[in-house]
């Protein structure tokens, strides 16, 4: 940063007093202080954001390393399992001498795990709404269709009995 001693600050203050004047100097000093504070906060925010980005990049690298290590472990396990199954099948074929069992042994050695299924549609709003059981939706009062206020009042108003309505006439 800039080296400002007391003598330099006094010189700057004297020049500012002469140039700006004693009436406007406090207002200008407050404005300058506010601008310097904003600049310092902006610099601190930029530093924090840069450090966060660096940490995120390191985490991404670590994640890819872990995923690669997991894939390697899965492949080695699969290779060992297939090697052992082929050995077992060979010994079984030697013991039984059945040609049909030899075909199943080769098919077992060629077995590969199914690829992971994509989760298409799981994040859609409609699927989330329809995932709840109907009895739970009814009990909790989850509305599936829009209904106007008048229709809702009519739906929840108790029915008028015919005997009560005859006694209350406008003309009586």
UniProtKB/Swiss-Prot annotation:
Membrane topology: Single-pass membrane protein
Transmembrane regions listed in the UniProt entry: 1-21
Coiled coil: none
Subcellular localization: Cell inner membrane
Keywords: Cell inner membrane, Cell membrane, Membrane, Protein transport, Translocation, Transmembrane, Transmembrane helix, Transport
Record-linked Pfam families: TatA_B_E
Oligomeric form and interacting partners: The Tat system comprises two distinct complexes: a TatABC complex, containing multiple copies of TatA, TatB and TatC subunits, and a separate TatA complex, containing only TatA subunits. Substrates initially bind to the TatABC complex, which probably triggers association of the separate TatA complex to form the active translocon.
PANTHER family xrefs: SEC-INDEPENDENT PROTEIN TRANSLOCASE PROTEIN TATA, CHLOROPLASTIC (PTHR33162:SF1)
Protein name: Sec-independent protein translocase protein TatB
Name of the gene encoding the protein in the UniProt record: tatB
């Amino acid at each position: 940063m800039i080296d400002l001693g007391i003598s330099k600050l006094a010189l700057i203050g004297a020049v500012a007093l002469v140039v700006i004047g004693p009436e406007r100097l406090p207002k200008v000093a407050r404005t300058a202080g506010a601008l310097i504070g904003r600049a310092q906060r902006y610099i601190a925010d930029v530093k924090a954001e840069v450090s966060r980005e660096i940490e995120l990049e390191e985490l991404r690298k670590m994640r890819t390393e872990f995923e690669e290590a997991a894939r390697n472990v899965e492949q080695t396990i699969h290779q060992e399992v297939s090697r052992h199954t082929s050995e077992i099948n060979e010994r079984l074929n030697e013991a039984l001498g059945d040609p049909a069992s030899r075909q199943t042994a080769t098919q077992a050695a060629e077995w590969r795990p199914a690829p992971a299924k994509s989760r298409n549609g799981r994040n859609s709003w409609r699927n989330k709404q329809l995932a709840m059981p109907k009895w739970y939706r009814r009990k909790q009062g989850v509305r599936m269709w829009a209904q106007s206020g008048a229709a809702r009042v009519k739906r929840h108003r108790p029915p008028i009995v015919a005997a009560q309505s005859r006694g209350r006439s406008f003309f009586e």
